[in-house]
């Protein structure tokens, strides 16, 4: 029986997070890929250490699963300071933010994931914390209300977002270091898979690692998740070692095609072709037709489909490309003929 694998599996459960943490590099030396980003961070971190001061605030942005959390942890490790993690949706009110900020030791790193989802009132409190290392808190209500100023230890805020366009200009301006993470090439992903296989103590040939890498959508998190699934097939259907044959068998069973597209990716393309004659069509309409969340399609699936040339954005909406027709075995001519006959 086939088991579908889709990208939403990587909104990590606690067990999956433990697995990912076991594979997470802890230093710049061990981090594969993102060479320009890592090289710049090495310089910034070393300079901050030489001056014995907090590193400038860092904004990391790019698609999910490319290493934003990992790099944040590495920054703290390389600085030799504490590392605290939270996320935009968790910081619901100013008191939540104040509790986190006042717990920081000098020069600690505070990582806020999904920083674009901070509420406006919490974001405003963050401004003075980032600029002046202080916050103003209101005590009591009504006529007896008063503001007290709380001084904070110097700290580095590392904000991560998959949707940098949603950040307000005032918040973006307060990050002294702004870095974009790109998708990884297959050679780098193959190295990551081989390293992870070694940590998991599962033999994996370089050819098999390359095969898994080629279907990992340029994303280390997906590469490690696929390795975990292929390991299951190797233990149950094979000898326990991962070779090209068992890798291909597992990936086919998981409905991951040679481009790394899963069932949802192909449904998106098929829906645009079959129901909307290839487009253009609006994102909300696509989401409604699929019964999916528009934000998930835009954030998780669409970037890779556009990068690989299966989909394009136009002022009038999304359109599939000729490559998508070829990939799905559909006729572009028939679709256009139907369009003009309507």
Curated annotation (Swiss-Prot):
Residues 1-184 are annotated as: Large ATPase domain (RuvB-L). Residues 258-342 are annotated as: Head domain (RuvB-H). Residues 185-255 are annotated as: Small ATPAse domain (RuvB-S). ATP binds at residues 23-24, 65, 68-70, 131-133, 174, 184, 221. The RuvA-RuvB-RuvC complex processes Holliday junction (HJ) DNA during genetic recombination and DNA repair, while the RuvA-RuvB complex plays an important role in the rescue of blocked DNA replication forks via replication fork reversal (RFR). RuvA specifically binds to HJ cruciform DNA, conferring on it an open structure. The RuvB hexamer acts as an ATP-dependent pump, pulling dsDNA into and through the RuvAB complex. RuvB forms 2 homohexamers on either side of HJ DNA bound by 1 or 2 RuvA tetramers; 4 subunits per hexamer contact DNA at a time. Homohexamer. Forms an RuvA(8)-RuvB(12)-Holliday junction (HJ) complex. HJ DNA is sandwiched between 2 RuvA tetramers; dsDNA enters through RuvA and exits via RuvB. An RuvB hexamer assembles on each DNA strand where it exits the tetramer. Each RuvB hexamer is contacted by two RuvA subunits (via domain III) on 2 adjacent RuvB subunits; this complex drives branch migration. In the full resolvosome a probable DNA-RuvA(4)-RuvB(12)-RuvC(2) complex forms which resolves the HJ. Belongs to the RuvB family. This is Holliday junction branch migration complex subunit RuvB. The gene is ruvB.
């Amino acid at each position: 029986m086939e088991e579908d694998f889709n990208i939403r599996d990587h909104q990590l459960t606690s067990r999956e997070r433990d697995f990912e943490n076991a594979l997470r590099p802890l230093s710049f030396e061990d981090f594969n890929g993102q060479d320009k980003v890592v090289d710049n961070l090495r310089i910034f971190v070393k300079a901050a250490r030489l001056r014995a001061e907090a590193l400038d605030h860092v904004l990391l942005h790019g698609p999910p699963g490319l290493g934003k959390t990992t790099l944040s942890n590495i920054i703290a490790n390389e600085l030799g300071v504490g590392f605290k993690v939270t996320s935009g949706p968790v910081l619901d009110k100013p008191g939540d933010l104040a509790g986190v900020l006042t717990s920081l030791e000098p020069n600690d790193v505070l990582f806020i994931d999904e920083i674009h989802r901070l509420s406006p009132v919490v974001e405003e409190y963050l401004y003075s914390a980032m600029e002046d290392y202080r916050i103003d808190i209101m005590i009591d209500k009504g006529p007896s209300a008063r503001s007290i100023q709380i001084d904070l230890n110097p700290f580095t805020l590392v904000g991560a977002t998959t949707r940098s366009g949603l950040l307000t200009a005032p918040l973006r301006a307060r990050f002294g270091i702004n870095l974009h993470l790109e998708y990884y090439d297959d050679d780098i992903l193959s190295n990551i898979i081989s390293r992870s296989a070694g940590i998991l103590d599962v033999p994996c040939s370089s050819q098999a690692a390359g095969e898994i890498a080629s279907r990992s959508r340029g994303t280390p998190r997906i590469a490690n998740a696929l390795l975990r699934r292929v390991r299951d097939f190797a233990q149950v259907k094979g000898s326990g070692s991962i070779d090209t044959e068992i890798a291909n068998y597992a990936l086919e069973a998981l409905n991951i095609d040679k481009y790394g597209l899963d069932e949802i990716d192909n449904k998106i393309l098929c829906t645009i072709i079959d129901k909307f004659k290839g487009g253009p069509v609006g994102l909300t309409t696509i989401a409604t037709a699929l019964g999916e969340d528009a934000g998930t399609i835009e954030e998780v699936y669409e970037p890779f489909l556009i990068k690989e040339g299966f989909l394009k954005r136009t002022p009038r909406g999304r359109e599939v490309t000729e490559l998508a027709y070829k990939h799905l075995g559909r006729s572009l001519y028939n679709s256009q003929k139907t369009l003009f006959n309507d």
